[in-house]
Structures are given as C-alpha cells and as structure tokens.
Regions:
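All-alpha RGS (Regulator of G-protein Signaling) helical domain and cognate RGS-like helical scaffolds
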Residues: 2-11, 20-24, 29-263
Length: 263
C-alpha cells in the first residue's frame, strides 16, 4: 500500500463494483436505524459509500491487530505496550459494529493481504500499521467533510480521534521492540513514505488529510490490501491470506463507550 495507488479512477470503480457499494446506496435505506433518518433528507447513497468503505477499513484494522497479538515479537513487548495493541483491537471492532448497524451490511471484503514479512518483522508491521492508521484518519476526515448528517459527521470525528491515538501508540511501541526482534525501532515510515523519528511519538500538530477529498482516494489506498489482484501487483504475499473474524468487543472504559450519536 502506498500513495502511488491513490486516485486511480478505474481501480476505484472496479473495487466499488465488486463491493456492491453502488447498490448498497439504495438497498439498505429501508433498514437503517432511526438515527440515520433523523434529518428530513435521511441518509444518502454517498453516506453509505463512505460507511461501507469505513467498514472495510475497520475489518482490515481488526484483522491487523489480531495478528499482531499473535506475532512472535508481540510477546517480547512490555505489558503496557501489549495493552495498547489489545485495546486498539477492541476499539476497531466496536467501530466496525457501529458502522454495520447503520448500513445494515457486513463488510464486502473480509480477506486481506500484506507484505511477505508482515507479522514476522516488527519494523514492517509497525510501518504498515502506521500507514493504515494514516489512511484511516484521512478517510474519516473525508466523512467529516462529506457526510450529509450532522450526527454522522460528529461520529466520524469521534472515531478519527481514536485512530489518531492508535497511530501515536504504534509509534510509542516502536522503541520498545526487543533487540532480538530488530529493536529498538527509532523511525517509522507511514503512508507518505517518509521515515519519521518516533521521538516524540505524537508528532502531529494537526491531523494529516493526505490531500484527500473523496472517499475513492481512501478506497484506492486500501485496494492492495483488500483485493488479491491488486495485492499481487503491489508485491504482497497472496499465498497467505488473513481473514476477518468478528467478535463482541469489550472496551477499556465505560466512559469511552458509544452511548449515542448525540455524544
């Protein structure tokens, strides 16, 4: 996954077609909960397109964090660093279920592909993880711009804040990687392709939009991870697919749970 894939109109149309997102704009409107219909105009096909793209991203995030917890280097992390990863897994699953409750649809993509040394190399894993979080942050900011419903805009901002936490915490974990696992890792390369020092781990004054203004740009960035043909073109290991397995999440603190779309 890199920024070179972003903006391909043909790839975006192919991806949307295979995901069935265009049909979802009409097919799911009748099944949406009351909150999605609160405004006179209701939820729009554009809203559904963003939400289904977000579901794909969250399914990918859950799959990524799940397999990080199974990686050999994970066992050698400090307990608090392990806790960051485990909590992020729960949070991403909660995001997925919330979005699914609005669309009435499951993610159309549930199998994902990574570089060959993903989960065996801590450096590769953290670079990919931060790249994904970069993409998720920018994608939710598109939702903030483009959702037709105020409650959905605010919810996108609330989720984006958590994705920002995850990006920072991945950078916190990097120096704690054990020497036997290639640590300490002092630089992380995210989606912009620039190696950035992990000191400080919270190195953004403002979240990065990546210049994205349309959800198709986020979809194009995720294409090599979610689509086998695109993964092969990107040089990813398609012989070892990873499957999304939903579960019932337990969030770390009741005060931080989703109580309503109103906040």
């Amino acid at each position: 996954m890199n920024r070179e894939t972003v903006g391909s109109g043909t790839d975006r149309r192919t991806f949307l077609g295979r995901a069935g997102i265009a049909a979802a704009g009409v097919a799911t409107l009748g099944a949406l909960p009351a909150i999605a219909k609160a405004d006179a105009g209701g939820i729009t096909p554009g809203d559904v397109e963003i939400l289904v793209a977000a579901e794909i991203a969250e399914a990918l995030a859950v799959t990524t964090y799940t397999n990080i917890t199974r990686a050999a280097f994970f066992a050698n992390l400090a307990s608090d660093d392990q806790g960051y990863i485990e909590a992020a897994r729960q949070e991403e699953m909660s995001h997925y279920l919330l979005e699914q409750s609005v669309t009435g649809k499951s993610s159309p993509f549930t199998t994902f592909y990574y570089p060959a040394d993903m989960f065996s190399s801590a450096r590769t894993t953290l670079n990919v993880l931060v790249s994904l979080e970069d993409a998720f942050i920018a994608a939710y900011l598109i939702g903030v711009r483009q959702f037709s419903h105020d409650d959905l805009r605010v919810t996108a901002a609330r989720i984006m804040g958590i994705e920002s936490d995850h990006r920072t915490l991945a950078r916190v974990v990097a120096p704690g990687v054990a020497a036997q696992d290639g640590g300490p890792i002092e630089e992380i390369t995210g989606l912009q392709g620039v190696a950035e020092s992990v000191d400080p781990p919270n190195n953004n004054g403002y979240e990065r939009t990546l210049g994205w203004t349309k959800i198709g740009q986020a979809i194009a960035a995720l294409l090599p991870v979610a689509d086998k043909d695109a993964a092969e073109k990107a040089g990813f290991d398609t012989s070892k697919p990873y499957t999304f397995h939903p579960f019932t999440p337990v969030l770390p603190n009741p005060l931080g749970e989703f109580h309503s779309f109103k906040g």
